[in-house]
Amino acid sequence: TNLLFSVELVVEPYLQNATPNSMHVLWETDLNSQSVVEWGLYVFLSESTTGSSFSNYGSSRIHTVELTNLEPNTQYYYRIVVGNYESYSDLYSFITPPEPSSEADFRIVAMSDMQRDSSNPNKFNEIIHDGVIDYVSEQYSDNLSEALAMVLVPGDLVVTGSSYYQWQDHFFEPGSDLFAQVPLYPVFGNHEANS
């Protein structure tokens, strides 16, 4: 019997290592599959870039695709291909940073010690959605990538860094609406224990 396995998205796309001319898009699937991002200046996504993946936990794979030759301070739209074009992520956007010589102002979000607290297990989700996203949308713009340049989380992202499911359920899932549009810069603390 031939069984078909459908690739599932385990961690929604998130952005890292933004430069004026490039952006890294990462995500995780439960099985091995290709690493493809469709992207463009407009929602019809005229470009496609292939990256690579590596083993994470069990059969899961972390995918990384570097989008290059981008223009500084420019909005791009993207989505990831899940499996072999079986499905797609939602459509997201990001804005590349301006050239450093422009000395443009920018806003960041910095928060630390976001690990789950058993007495208040939904606090990180509340901070992301009720705090950051709602506040930024009301004060600056509904377009998060236009309003924020980066998210900095210096330490203690999860309680136990060696626990695979804490990363998935306690960090990436609550932050996914923000991390898919604004580059994430985590710094490991003592709770991550060199994970």
List the model feature ranges, each with a label.
Residues T1-S6:
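Sec-dependent, cleavable N-terminal signal peptides
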Residues V7-F188, E192-S195:
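Divalent metal-dependent phosphoesterase catalytic cores across multiple superfamilies
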